[in-house]
Amino acid sequence: MSGRGKGGKGLGKGARKRHRKVLRDNIQGITKPAIRRLARRGGVKRISGLIYEETRGVRKIFLENVIRDAVTYTEHARRKTVTAMDVVYALKRQGRTLYGFGG
């Protein structure tokens, strides 16, 4: 580990910081037509106008919970990369078993 400074095992070698695009209001990324398509797939015929913001809020809370659990699994394993299995285990913990991603 000589000559690496704070880098550790070669992860993030301390090169210059890249400028990251500031992501503001990303919750709007799921569009009104996308929500409508999901509802149609679920058998919904008519949709109230208030549903769209409510759906975005519920989706945000759901993803926060899944990501929090997945990151907890990652940190417990002393890794820096969240794997598909971390997400599978996080979903299983919440009672939403997902098949097809290993394990």
Swiss-Prot record:
Keywords: Acetylation, Chromosome, DNA-binding, Methylation, Nucleosome core, Nucleus. Residues 17-21 bind DNA. GO terms for molecular function: DNA binding; protein heterodimerization activity; structural constituent of chromatin. It is found in: Nucleus; Chromosome. The modification N-acetylserine is found at residue 2. It holds the Pfam family CENP-T_C. The modification N6-acetyllysine is found at residues 6, 9, 13, 17, 21. The keyword Aminoacyl-tRNA synthetase does not apply. The modification N6-methyllysine is found at residue 21. One of its GO terms (cellular component) is nucleosome. One of its GO terms (biological process) is nucleosome assembly. Its main location: nucleus. CDD domains: HFD_H4. Lys-21Me2 and Lys-21Me3 not detected. Core component of nucleosome. Nucleosomes wrap and compact DNA into chromatin, limiting DNA accessibility to the cellular machineries which require DNA as a template. Histones thereby play a central role in transcription regulation, DNA repair, DNA replication and chromosomal stability. DNA accessibility is regulated via a complex set of post-translational modifications of histones, also called histone code, and nucleosome remodeling. The nucleosome is a histone octamer containing two molecules each of H2A, H2B, H3 and H4 assembled in one H3-H4 heterotetramer and two H2A-H2B heterodimers. The octamer wraps approximately 147 bp of DNA. Belongs to the histone H4 family. PANTHER family: HISTONE H4. This is Histone H4.3. It comes from Zea mays (Maize).
